[in-house]
Design a protein with these regions (language model features):
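Mobile beta-alpha loop/short-helix "lid" or hinge segments that flank ligand
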Residues: 34-45, 95-97, 130-150
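Short amphipathic alpha-helical patches
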Residues: 49, 85-88, 112-117, 130-133, ...
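Glycine-rich NAD(P)-binding loop of Rossmann-like domains
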Residues: 99-101, 150-155
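Short, glycine-/small-residue-rich phosphate/pyrophosphate-handling segment
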Residues: 103-143, 158
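N-terminal beta1-alpha1-beta2 submodule of the flavodoxin-like/Rossmannoid cofactor-binding fold
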Residues: 1-95, 153-179
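A generic structural signal for short beta-strands and their flanking turns/coil linkers
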Residues: 29-31, 100-102, 137
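Short, flexible coil/turn micro-motifs enriched in small/turn-prone residues
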Residues: 2, 7, 79, 103, ...
């Protein structure tokens, strides 16, 4: 099963809207998927004592990562970087087993012209350090507000085709690594 990580905890985020479209693509391809939305992280995880002892309410999130065959991270760009909650989530996971030899795919979006290039590259460095297998096909969505319609759906057919191609390729990548 692939885990789709919604890389922000911002309510009503464009990241969540894009993740919903990726869910539809995975479902259409009949690829088993679970969604891990960082907006649903338990509040007690943000206590300084959580580094030493993880709250029991965090275990389902940590277990989802450990049991996943691959991770598809959807990240926005906040201040030229990865959202703090996404980095914190990564830091809270078990080391090294959470990402060791795990396939990881990245989709980035931003209001600006670079489409989250910086945070995706930062995440590639982090996951590479953690010995993950980085899927080389990344999709960047610059000026995201121009790419979504009033209902939050991606209105650009070429972009949807790129996302579908990314998902198809990543699903094959995960299967090859599992084999």
């Amino acid at each position: 099963m692939i885990t789709l990580i919604v890389g922000t905890n911002r309510p009503g985020s464009n990241t969540r809207k894009v993740a919903a479209q990726l869910e539809e693509i995975y479902a259409g391809l009949k690829v088993p998927l679970q969604v891990l939305d960082l907006a649903k992280l338990p509040q007690e995880i943000f206590s300084p004592t959580s580094y030493a002892e993880k709250p029991k309410s965090f275990l389902p999130f940590a277990d989802a990562i450990l049991k996943s065959d691959g991770l598809h991270v959807v990240t926005p760009e906040y201040n030229g970087s990865v959202p703090g909650v996404l980095k914190y989530f990564i830091d809270m996971l078990k080391f090294p087993e959470s990402f060791e030899q795990k396939p990881v795919c990245f989709t980035g979006l931003a209001a600006g012209i670079w489409g989250a290039l910086r945070p995706v590259e930062q995440l590639q460095a982090i996951f590479g350090y953690r010995n993950a297998h980085l899927f080389p096909v990344r999709v960047f969505m610059p000026q995201i507000n121009n790419l979504l319609d009033a209902s939050g759906k991606i209105k650009d057919a070429e972009l949807l085709a790129r996302l579908k191609s990314q998902v198809e390729g990543f699903a094959k990548f995960v299967e090859k690594i599992k084999a």
